[in-house]
């Protein structure tokens, strides 16, 4: 279930759903030229595509939808939402959805079922909004756990920017925006896909890329269509050399027999492969698994093997999300002990690595 190394192995666009207004945007015209052979299907809204969103029958075409379908839309609500963990703000998304199919992903919970990539073509409006928003913030008043100098904007909450960058220049435009036009802030995103084209972007330390990592054995089961873990680790030194700040996102942490021993192996690989420059700037984020009852039921139709480790009622409890969704997480006391174990392991085996947060 692990793909090859290029975006072409992930995407073979045969159909493009698009809002009619997108044709007035240069970014849309560039994408349509790139995928000139695709069938074009006009839709009133990128949110209202019945055969893709909220349609239970689409579970049978889960992977093919993500590989063969692209949606072009216009981001209408531009707002930067406050955050307190990986960033100070969550920026307006340049995309929504993903070509990868991680079985635990929260994005399909919000939009429904396969949720292939939607590219928002009004990137100039998004950039202009961010330019104004950052200007209003002034200088970061004090060093905090997020950054010691800059306001940080998350740009990839609803997708994987490394994959998006294989479709169009939205991500490049945002990297250039923060590098050239926004002096008091940087951007960040997490990724499970190695796109070496990003090494040409010259971010000048104004982009923090967070490589999502977990033990390879578990990744093979649940990280469907993503870059193998060792390949992600292999490029971390290259990204630091190319001017990125490189962090790691230990997420999601999944409990199973032998889980901590597998994390030791992953940490050993990091210690062996990372050079001193990468180690000295490394920060980790640790996030334990949260799952969802509806997504569990969908997964049972296309990837039931993963649910054997993701859906563990005997050690999980109900958690209601801010939007009212019925989610599950590890039981409070059980989870605290596991978090403490992993944090202790990281501090012991990776003394150079600060932990931004763990929960």
List where the protein language model places each region.
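Conserved, mostly hydrophobic/aromatic
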Residues: 102-105, 211, 248-251
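Auxiliary Fe-S-binding modules of radical SAM enzymes
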Residues: 1-28, 271-359
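Local cysteine-cluster metal-coordination motifs and their immediate loop/turn environment
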Residues: 93-110
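Conserved Radical SAM active-site core
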Residues: 71-84, 107-210
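Conserved radical SAM core fold
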Residues: 155-163, 194-197, 207-226, 252-257, ...
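Flexible, acidic/Gly-rich N-terminal and inter-domain linker regions that tether
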Residues: 1-88
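Catalytic cores of alpha/beta
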Residues: 258-273
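Structural preference for beta-strand elements that scaffold enzyme active sites
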Residues: 150-154, 186-188, 206-210, 245-249, ...
């Amino acid at each position: 279930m692990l793909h090859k190394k290029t975006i072409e192995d992930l995407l073979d666009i045969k159909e493009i759903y698009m809002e009619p207004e997108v044709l007035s945007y240069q970014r849309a015209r560039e994408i349509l030229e790139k995928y000139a052979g695709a069938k074009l299907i006009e839709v009133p809204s990128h949110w209202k595509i019945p055969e893709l969103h909220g349609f239970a029958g689409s579970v049978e075409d889960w992977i093919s939808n993500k590989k063969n379908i692209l949606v072009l839309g216009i981001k209408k609500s531009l707002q930067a939402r406050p955050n307190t963990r990986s960033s100070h703000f969550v920026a307006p998304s340049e995309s929504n959805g993903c070509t990868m199919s991680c079985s635990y992903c929260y994005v399909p919970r919000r939009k429904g079922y396969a949720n292939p990539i939607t590219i928002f073509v009004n990137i100039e409006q998004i950039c202009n909004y961010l330019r104004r928003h950052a200007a209003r913030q002034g200088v970061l008043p004090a060093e905090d756990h997020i950054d010691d100098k800059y306001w940080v904007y998350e740009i990839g909450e609803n997708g994987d920017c490394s994959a998006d960058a294989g479709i169009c220049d939205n991500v490049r435009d945002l990297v250039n925006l923060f590098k050239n036009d926004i002096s008091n802030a940087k951007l960040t995103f997490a990724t499970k896909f190695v796109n070496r084209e990003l090494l040409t972007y010259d971010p000048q330390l104004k982009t923090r890329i967070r490589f999502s990592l977990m033990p390879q054995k578990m990744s093979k089961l649940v990280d469907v269509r993503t870059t193998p873990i060792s390949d992600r680790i292999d490029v971390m030194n290259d990204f630091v050399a190319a001017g990125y700040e490189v962090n790691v996102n230990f997420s999601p942490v999944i409990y199973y027999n032998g889980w901590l021993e597998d994390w030791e192996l992953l940490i050993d690989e990091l210690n062996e492969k990372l050079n001193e420059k990468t180690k000295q700037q490394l920060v980790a984020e640790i996030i334990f698994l949260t799952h969802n009852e509806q997504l569990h039921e969908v997964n049972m139709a296309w990837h039931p093997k993963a649910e054997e480790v993701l859906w563990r009622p005997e050690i999980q409890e109900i958690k209601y999300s801010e939007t009212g969704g019925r989610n599950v997480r590890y039981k409070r006391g059980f989870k605290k002990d596991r978090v403490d174990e992993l944090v202790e392991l990281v501090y012991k085996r990776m003394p150079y690595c600060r932990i931004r947060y763990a929960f």
